[in-house]
Design a protein with these regions (language model features):
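Basic, flexible Lys/Arg- and Gly-enriched helix-loop patches that mediate nucleic-acid binding at interfaces
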Residues: 1-203
């Protein structure tokens, strides 16, 4: 693990697994090795469209492939140095669909994941959802009826399970603001479809 993380140097050069080492070679261990190895990392990533939150699927790359030293935020003042060990067991705490963009939390720490997405998590997730009507709307009627708005707030089921109450409001004429405390697969898109709306953008 230390070799994979780049913490072992042979004559000043990072060692590789299986490398043969001469008896006279100078072996060094990065002094941060023990402290960094004990630390579990959490990464905040702005996921672009076209990446999946978790494992690769249907030819699309997982968002974790964007976690590199080169992509680190220039103004990040954290003293922790990036190494490949940070990618081990780095899992998303929540999900964003492949065609959604926004904040994705990746963590090695199960405690962080539980706080964010556990059944009793108090953390709310906010989304801006651009929508359009799936069917022609009669003149004088709104895309979303009062009954439809009430259903979005409370009273829907997905896959036979009732959804937790949500806060939904209009952000502008074609964009809804959703505040959720859970994250089922394609939840917002499916909720919108149930009230006759299609999603054209989600962040």
């Amino acid at each position: 693990e230390w070799i994979e993380a780049g913490w072992v140097l042979v004559d000043g050069v990072p060692a590789v697994l299986g490398q043969r080492v001469a008896p006279e070679a100078r072996i060094e261990i990065d002094p941060l090795a023990r402290t960094q190895q004990a630390q579990r990392v959490t990464v905040l990533l702005h996921k672009p469209i076209g990446y999946v939150s978790g494992q690769a699927e249907d030819g699309y790359q997982p968002a974790v492939t964007l976690v590199t030293a080169a992509n680190r935020w220039a103004e990040d003042k954290a003293p922790l140095k990036f190494h490949h060990g940070h990618l081990r067991s780095l899992a998303p705490a929540g999900r964003l669909d492949i065609d959604s963009t926004g904040l994705l939390v990746l963590t090695q720490d199960g405690r962080v994941a539980k706080q964010l997405i556990g059944d009793d998590s108090p953390v709310e997730k906010e989304y801006l959802v651009r929508v359009r009507p799936l069917r022609p709307v009669p003149a004088g009627e709104h895309w979303l009826s009062e009954q439809g708005m009430r259903a979005l707030h409370h009273g829907m089921e997905l896959d036979g399970r009732r959804l937790k109450p949500a806060r939904v409001s209009w952000a502008n004429e074609d964009q809804l603001r959703f505040v959720l405390r859970e994250g089922r697969k394609r939840q917002i898109r499916r909720m919108c479809e149930l009230v006759g709306l299609g999603v054209t953008g989600l962040k």
